[in-house]
């Protein structure tokens, strides 16, 4: 239903709009929806889905998921042996887990590194055995490598949630240390419990075949739980329970599909073995870890978008360039200062600035400045001013802003919204121009903003 904005006629007409305009229209409608509407109708649900996926894809590209997955895959490959060494070392402290080491290896290799054969097991066992003779300083170094991987995961996920304020050192170290030390114990405990249930319930009694099939879903269930805890606990921001559930289900399904595809690829298209020979296990392992991180970050982006795109009325109004001119000047001033110091600001650096400016609004302002040609991107993913701010006036800025004086030169409106006659409109524009001849450099240097 579209009460208050045109009814059925508007529903038919809006389908004929260009894609970008259509998405903007849908987003605006979703934010203007009555806040008392707790549920979406069928048509509203269809509209929400049509808006959600472009919104998800835009954030997916903006957050550079594929690039982040590659970075995490490389660091994971370097941290794999230290992480497994630390995990097994902690498990060896508890005698009850001593018999589970072999089972843990089988579980990890079968469910998380499929299709790589026994070669990987032999290499990992050889590397891990060598770490047992490492001196104390080397053990500390292994812990540092493992902690750095956990820290990188934490920072990457929080960037997706647009949380750029770093955790306090004590808080971050406590969190990472808890994950590293208690994580293996919890994994071992779950394996003990699973083994107990297997031997006492699933290996005897009626319906043995059905029980065996149900047990085959255990890896999928473990994946759902792991993804849920990751999306629920790691972001330094409140995440709704059901959003984390939906994201963990999506990630678990993609994870199972990627496992099947990877096994099929390795068994039917042995490209790595032909090219790399005995060293093929390294690129195969890297490729698989890369796929895993793409799945993990895709699920995280999905959870973030579920929490960001709301069908109910938005608390914050959409950004109005004309009313937000002071915020535009603030961002322009940051970019100009960075350019003068020789360190162009990136989007991440702009969002980290200590000012009451929402990350989404800062992104909208940068996009607006780019579209207006006021700033441009640099080779190192930063931004720089495109024109001489000593020659560009405040009026010039207003004419380039969407909805500003240059939006429609043939129409000038009064305070009541009525279109003024052309002659009066030109006089009004000329008067405003003469009053706004101050250069932008002067505005920014005097810190009028």
UniProtKB/Swiss-Prot annotation:
Keywords: Cell inner membrane, Cell membrane, Membrane, Transmembrane, Transmembrane helix. InterPro entries: UPF0761_bac, Virul_fac_BrkB. The keyword Cell membrane applies. One of its GO terms (cellular component) is plasma membrane. The chain crosses the membrane at residues 77-97, 133-153, 173-193, 214-234, 244-264, 277-297. It comes from the Bacteria. It is a multi-pass membrane protein. Pfam families: Virul_fac_BrkB (PF03631). It is found in: Cell inner membrane. Belongs to the UPF0761 family. This is UPF0761 membrane protein Cpha266_1653. It comes from Chlorobium phaeobacteroides (strain DSM 266 / SMG 266 / 2430).
